[in-house]
């Protein structure tokens, strides 16, 4: 059973991915068999694993930092924006359709949760340390009921959660308060 640590943010672009990448490297150098995990990622560009599965590039960088090959279980749900309020949904590395944001969150995200759980179980049984990255902010109450990437994952994995905030830039969390 892997030890787990989770990072969530006050918003997107606060540094969760780079921090998770750094920690993957640190744990790897300390001798832990480490794996990154992000249940759901949104990105225009993806990476194709040697098994032909699409995953987010951030998880690829994190896998490289951990000294392992990227695998689909690191990022079971990938949303690739296709236009105004819609995305191509990639589940376990394979495209399954294009959904509006509303359709995805109300009809599909909880269906994808089964694959997320399977991925967590696989990683948990094959690694010593799991570095888990949330997405956006856990405080987005409009998404809470169908959340498959933040607090639901924290509860599912029983991982301690660290909140990341950004003080740099025009739209930092401190300027929103």
Describe each model-derived feature in a short phrase.
Residues 1-176:
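Flexible phosphate-sensing "switch/lid" loops adjacent to ATP/NTP-binding sites
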């Amino acid at each position: 059973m892997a030890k787990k640590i989770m990072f969530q943010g006050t918003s997107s672009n606060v540094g969760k991915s780079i921090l998770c990448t750094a920690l993957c490297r640190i744990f790897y150098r300390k001798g832990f068999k480490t794996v990154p995990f992000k249940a759901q990622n949104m990105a225009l560009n993806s990476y194709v694993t040697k098994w032909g599965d699409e995953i987010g590039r951030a998880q690829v960088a994190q896998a490289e930092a951990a000294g392992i090959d990227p695998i689909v279980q690191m990022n079971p749900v990938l949303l690739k924006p296709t236009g105004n309020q819609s995305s191509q949904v990639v589940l376990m590395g394979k495209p399954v359709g294009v959904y509006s944001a509303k359709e995805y969150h109300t009809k599909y995200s909880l269906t994808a949760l089964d694959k997320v759980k399977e991925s967590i179980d696989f990683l948990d049984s094959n690694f010593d340390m799991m570095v888990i990255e949330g997405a956006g902010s856990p405080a987005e109450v409009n998404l809470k009921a169908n959340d498959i990437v933040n607090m639901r994952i924290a509860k599912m994995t029983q991982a301690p959660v660290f909140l990341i905030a950004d003080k740099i830039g025009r739209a930092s969390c401190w300027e929103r308060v």
